[in-house]
Design a protein with these regions (language model features):
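Short secondary-structure transition hinges
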Residues: 95-143, 149-150
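C-terminal peripheral helix-coil segments that are non-catalytic and often amphipathic
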Residues: 132, 171-230
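Hydrophobic alpha-helical connector segments
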Residues: 60, 71-104, 117, 152-155
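All-alpha amphipathic helical-bundle segments outside canonical DNA-binding/catalytic cores
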Residues: 84-85, 121-122, 139-154, 172-178
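Generic hydrophobic, amphipathic alpha-helix propensity
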Residues: 10-18, 35, 61-65, 69, ...
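Helix-turn-helix
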Residues: 13, 21-56, 60
Length: 230
């Protein structure tokens, strides 16, 4: 078999086709065979040369989507906003970039240790970006002076691992109650991120992620937790 002279183009084509199918058919309904059938003659072997699985494709697609729409890049061009306002812009921009079906699928993958570890690493990196903006806010008076590093890390852990969580499963009412609790914590630290407008965005995120309204979800556990004996 001749070697592929353009591996990067092949990988890009697989990602483009996969994103199109995920959005049209849904992630769960799209199979590897569906992706291969839409690659214009490329084989299943070509797919597995670049990606280990459909889950691997989804992870890479999500990384590309959020890199293309990275609000931390565009915030550098914003003029006249203080540090707190910039953080709110980043937060709302990130929320508006969510693809509901893809994000729900990605959340389900966080039950797998490999993807959870990657999410933790991403959260660590994002906290560093928020730390810079928090320092700016502390300098301009929009955020109470304190430890910017700890505040950024705490905020990311609460929002990324407790509110939006593959471990602590919530229904809609509890999701909002958690957001209010986070608001109380951050307000107490002089970081008034979750104002009325941001709380509306939190509510929209809950809808986008498909957070259920019934209470049955409160008894559910992630797959790795079910393996732990009582």
């Amino acid at each position: 078999m001749p070697r592929n002279k353009y591996p990067e183009e092949t990988a890009k084509k697989i990602l483009d086709v996969s994103l199109k199918l995920f959005l049209e058919k849904g992630y769960e309904q799209t199979t590897v065979l569906d992706i291969v059938d839409n690659l214009g003659g490329l084989t299943r072997g070509a797919f597995y040369h670049h990606f280990k699985s459909k889950e691997d494709v989804l992870r890479t697609v999500m990384e590309r989507v959020y890199d293309d729409e990275d609000p931390f890049k565009s915030i550098k061009e914003v003029q006249g906003a203080n540090g707190l306002e910039k953080i709110k812009i980043v937060f709302s921009s990130g929320a508006s970039a969510i693809y509901p079906g893809l994000t729900r699928a990605a959340m389900s993958l966080l039950r797998q240790p490999r993807f959870l570890a990657k999410h933790l690493a991403d959260t660590h990196d994002t906290a560093k970006l928020f730390e810079t903006l928090i320092e700016e806010g502390m300098a301009d008076g929009s955020i109470r002076p304190g430890n910017a590093k700890f505040l950024a890390e705490l905020g990311m852990l609460l929002l990324n691992f407790w509110l939006v969580s593959p471990v602590f499963v919530s229904n809609k009412a509890e999701f909002i109650d958690k957001a209010v609790f986070i608001k109380q914590i951050l307000d107490g630290l002089g970081f008034t991120l979750l104002d009325e407008e941001m709380m509306k965005i939190i509510d929209t995120i809950a809808e986008t992620l498909g957070v259920p309204s019934d209470s049955d979800t409160l008894s559910s556990k992630p797959s790795f937790a079910k393996k732990i004996p009582p």
